[in-house]
Amino acid sequence: MPRPIVAKVDSAVLASNLSIVRRHAPQAQVWSVVKANGYGHGLNTVWQGLQQTDGFALLDLHEAVVLREKGWRGPILLLEGFFQPADLAVIDRYRLTTVVHSDWQIEALRRMTPRAPLDIYLKLNSGMNRLGFSERALPGAWQSLNALKHVATLTLMSHFAYADMPEGVEGQMAVVARAGEGLTGPRCLANSAATLWHPATHGQWVRPGIILYGASPSGNWQDIAASGLRPVMTLQSELIAVQSVPAGGRIGYGGRHRVSETHRVGVVACGYADGYPRHAPTGTPILVDGVRTSTLGAVSMDMLMVDLQLCPKARIGSAVELWGDHVKIDEVAASAGTLGYELMSALAPRVTVQIR
């Protein structure tokens, strides 16, 4: 028998989450962001649930080719652009849309002769200070690209650093307004947080990522609890052993947790080598036999321990939900001092993914 841990991905929930995104941005088209192997859900899995999207956005040229070969004929956006001039031949062949964020990329485009004009997303650094042209340099970059006969639609793009925080988007939107003054063309600005909470940013295209998979861009599930968004992935396993630990007994590596009275402790077939956060402390929420309880002690490579005091019927073989509908991935991430983004994308290849 295989190890009982499995990640179940519900493509119907993915489609429902996309519909909710559309209700938040009814006038915009949607780039469904499927980078990092579909946020850990599996590109081959998630694209089936996102067939009604307007386009897919990702990083890897190979994954873009995979989508084309699977039959996707709509737009595909390369979020980091191309990494060397030779990539342009693949972009041309598979009719991909590329981000441009550096002068050398403009020069490479100038030198190429594509079979048909390409759609380009010109990236503005409006305050993230990661990729993109400065406010001062952007108009010149726009003019250079706009002068090329083999550039079709030129879209202004930027990325918000604080859309999920009190600072919001106002400062960066002011930069976008100044840099884009007089530049006619579509705008693509809104990430997940801006799609939900800043409608003035929506423009012609929005780029939802984490919310498609049913987690919060802020890391706080309560921020999206009323939205109708649901987790797409359920990571589940089983109890593979039950221990009766006497009063004073210590749990796991380093004995980080000591029980004050005789305690039933369950052992779950899941550890940090499966993608569960190693730094999740005692008290991290978990569901055992339909009852919400918590972890005990340090997470091991292949196993973790759970408190069964509230689960009197739990036994070997009882179902365990690590995260999903009942224990949100944001809750587990917050307990471990990280974000749902990291946990999703860190799901280990050894975990079987099932589509339902």
From Swiss-Prot:
<dbReference type="InterPro" id="IPR000821">
    <property type="entry name" value="Ala_racemase"/>
</dbReference>
<dbReference type="InterPro" id="IPR029066">
    <property type="entry name" value="PLP-binding_barrel"/>
</dbReference>
<feature type="active site" description="Proton acceptor; specific for D-alanine">
    <location>
        <position position="35"/>
    </location>
</feature>
<protein>
    <recommendedName>
        <fullName>Alanine racemase</fullName>
        <ecNumber>5.1.1.1</ecNumber>
    </recommendedName>
</protein>
<keyword id="KW-0663">Pyridoxal phosphate</keyword>
<feature type="modified residue" description="N6-(pyridoxal phosphate)lysine">
    <location>
        <position position="35"/>
    </location>
</feature>
<feature type="binding site">
    <location>
        <position position="130"/>
    </location>
    <ligand>
        <name>substrate</name>
    </ligand>
</feature>
<dbReference type="Pfam" id="PF00842">
    <property type="entry name" value="Ala_racemase_C"/>
</dbReference>
<feature type="active site" description="Proton acceptor; specific for L-alanine">
    <location>
        <position position="253"/>
    </location>
</feature>
<dbReference type="GO" id="GO:0030632">
    <property type="term" value="P:D-alanine biosynthetic process"/>
</dbReference>
<comment type="function">
    <text>Catalyzes the interconversion of L-alanine and D-alanine. May also act on other amino acids.</text>
</comment>
<comment type="pathway">
    <text>Amino-acid biosynthesis; D-alanine biosynthesis; D-alanine from L-alanine: step 1/1.</text>
</comment>
<dbReference type="InterPro" id="IPR009006">
    <property type="entry name" value="Ala_racemase/Decarboxylase_C"/>
</dbReference>
<dbReference type="GO" id="GO:0008784">
    <property type="term" value="F:alanine racemase activity"/>
</dbReference>
<dbReference type="GO" id="GO:0005829">
    <property type="term" value="C:cytosol"/>
</dbReference>
<comment type="similarity">
    <text>Belongs to the alanine racemase family.</text>
</comment>
<dbReference type="Pfam" id="PF01168">
    <property type="entry name" value="Ala_racemase_N"/>
</dbReference>
<dbReference type="InterPro" id="IPR011079">
    <property type="entry name" value="Ala_racemase_C"/>
</dbReference>
<dbReference type="GO" id="GO:0030170">
    <property type="term" value="F:pyridoxal phosphate binding"/>
</dbReference>
<keyword id="KW-0413">Isomerase</keyword>
<feature type="binding site">
    <location>
        <position position="301"/>
    </location>
    <ligand>
        <name>substrate</name>
    </ligand>
</feature>
<dbReference type="InterPro" id="IPR020622">
    <property type="entry name" value="Ala_racemase_pyridoxalP-BS"/>
</dbReference>
<dbReference type="InterPro" id="IPR001608">
    <property type="entry name" value="Ala_racemase_N"/>
</dbReference>
